[in-house]
């Protein structure tokens, strides 16, 4: 139950690697309770997500991270960007919480889909000629970057847009100048759009 919660980062990461090796050699069943999505992804082949004592989803860890199915499960797996939607086509939605931006999906949007999600690392930055070329090619899912806020972490920039979308961009510990970090547009590939059910 929360085996690493009171440890500093260095010790926690080392012990997680050790536990991963122990579990790989263990032939029985083990149960781990955690709120840390990295622990789940690294240590568990299968997961069960609970909300107020009810099972939201259970199954293969990687499959659930790739397709969490419900809004609550998406949040628990770390998805920062979730918006209610209006279905406007078989493969097209309007994101009501993100200034009514329209998105094309790679899967059919069923009547039971209430929201979409986009993970903060799943955006492609675009600027200058790239933007022009994408627009001329009729590319979809282009998001203008308006009034961004930038926050620096040791190995990432957190960029939040005025419409509430989060983008996380990798950086090195030696980089502190935010100039050039923010592009004109972001693009979300249709395959990166999570189709979600249930309440936000």
Give the residues covered by each predicted segment.
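Secondary-structure boundary/capping residues
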Residues: 28-31, 82, 156
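Residues located in well-ordered beta-strands
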Residues: 60, 72, 84-86, 144-149
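C-terminal boundary and immediately downstream tail of ABC-type ATPase nucleotide-binding domains
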Residues: 66-91, 117
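ABC ATPase nucleotide-binding domains
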Residues: 1-72
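Non-catalytic connector elements of ABC transporters
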Residues: 80, 91-200
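Residue-level signal for well-ordered alpha-helical positions
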Residues: 10, 76, 129-130
């Amino acid at each position: 139950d929360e085996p690493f919660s009171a440890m500093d980062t260095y010790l926690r990461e080392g012990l997680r690697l050790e536990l991963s090796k122990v579990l790989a050699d263990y032939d029985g069943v083990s149960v781990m309770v955690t709120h840390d999505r990295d622990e789940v992804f690294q240590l568990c082949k299968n997961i069960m997500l609970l909300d107020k004592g009810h099972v939201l989803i259970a199954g293969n860890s990687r499959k659930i991270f790739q397709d969490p199915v419900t809004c609550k499960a998406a949040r628990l797996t770390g998805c920062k960007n979730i918006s209610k939607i209006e279905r406007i086509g078989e493969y097209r939605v309007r994101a009501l919480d993100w200034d009514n931006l329209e998105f094309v999906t790679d899967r059919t949007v069923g009547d039971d889909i209430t929201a979409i999600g986009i993970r903060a690392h799943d955006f492609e930055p675009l600027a200058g000629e790239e933007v022009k070329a994408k627009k001329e090619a009729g590319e979809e899912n282009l998001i203008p970057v308006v009034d961004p806020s930038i926050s620096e972490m040791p190995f990432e920039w957190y960029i939040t847009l005025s419409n509430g979308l989060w983008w996380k961009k990798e950086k090195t510990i030696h980089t502190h100048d935010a100039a050039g970090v923010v592009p004109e547009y972001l693009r979300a590939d249709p395959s990166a759009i999570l189709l979600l059910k249930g309440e936000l």
